[in-house]
Structures are given as C-alpha cells and as structure tokens.
Design a protein with these regions (language model features):
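C-terminal, surface-exposed recognition/capping segments
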Residues: 66-125
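Extracellular adhesion/carbohydrate-recognition regions
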Residues: 18-61, 97-100, 104, 112, ...
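Short hydrophobic alpha-helical membrane-anchoring segments
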Residues: 11-19
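Sec-dependent N-terminal signal peptides
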Residues: 4-12
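Alpha-helix boundary/capping residues
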Residues: 11, 57, 75-79
Length: 125
C-alpha cells in the first residue's frame, strides 16, 4: 500500500523537475562545442547548490569552468546574455573558494563558496 501511495508523489516530483529543467534549458545556444542553457536559474545559489542544480538538469548539463564562462562573456551578444551579475564556475581556487565571472566588465575573481552567485548551465556536444 505504501508503494502505491509513493508512486504518485514520485510522478509529481519528476514532472515538476522536468518542467523546471525545460524552463532553464529552453532553446540552448551553441557556442563552439558548447550548448548554453537559454536561461539562468531563477535565484542566486551557493557554489555546491549551483553544481548540484546544473547536474540535476540531466543529460550532461553542468556548471561551466572558469575558461568556459569567459567564452560566454566574449559571446554575450550572441547568447543574449546582458547581465551585471556574478556567475559561478566549477573551477575551484582553494578548498573554500571558487572562481566567478562578472558579466558587467568580464572580470574574474574567486569568492568563498558559501557566498551566492547566479548560475548558467552548459553542456558539451
């Protein structure tokens, strides 16, 4: 009986996750050998949450590296990525820090992973 009650809950959870993934990914933009999600996640996140959120999109979606984020900055017009925000990269600086890209001027710096920044997922193809 418990299994029968659990099944609808799992289906609702899957539907909500897949709808969220569709909203984030949208129509991906191609930059070189990368697919870039059309939209940011709706809120800023800590680094570990950002990594997990990208991976939870499935199908190889992930947080971009520091160098990949810089490529996105260089192509912000093509992507339609007009932002004055900081975005997480997957590149760690030291155990407690990771690199972010500032899309206001292209600068990169490292911040503590407990801080929050915006997130844009990518995947290679």
């Amino acid at each position: 009986m418990k299994k029968l009650l659990l099944l609808p809950l799992l289906l609702v959870t899957y539907f909500c996750l897949s709808q969220d993934a569709k909203a984030i990914i949208g129509k991906p933009i191609t930059i070189g050998n990368l697919l870039v999600a059309q939209n940011d996640f709706p809120k800023q996140m800590k680094w570990q949450d950002a990594k997990k959120a990208c991976e939870n999109l499935g199908r190889g979606w992930r947080l971009p590296t520091k160098d990949e984020l810089h490529i996105l900055y260089q192509n912000y017009v093509k992507i339609g990525f007009y932002s004055n925000n900081f975005y997480w990269s997957s590149t760690e600086f030291v155990f407690e820090s990771a690199w972010v890209q500032y899309f206001g001027n292209g600068g990169q710096l490292y911040i503590n992973k407990s801080e929050t920044s915006y997130v844009r997922a990518i995947r290679a193809f």
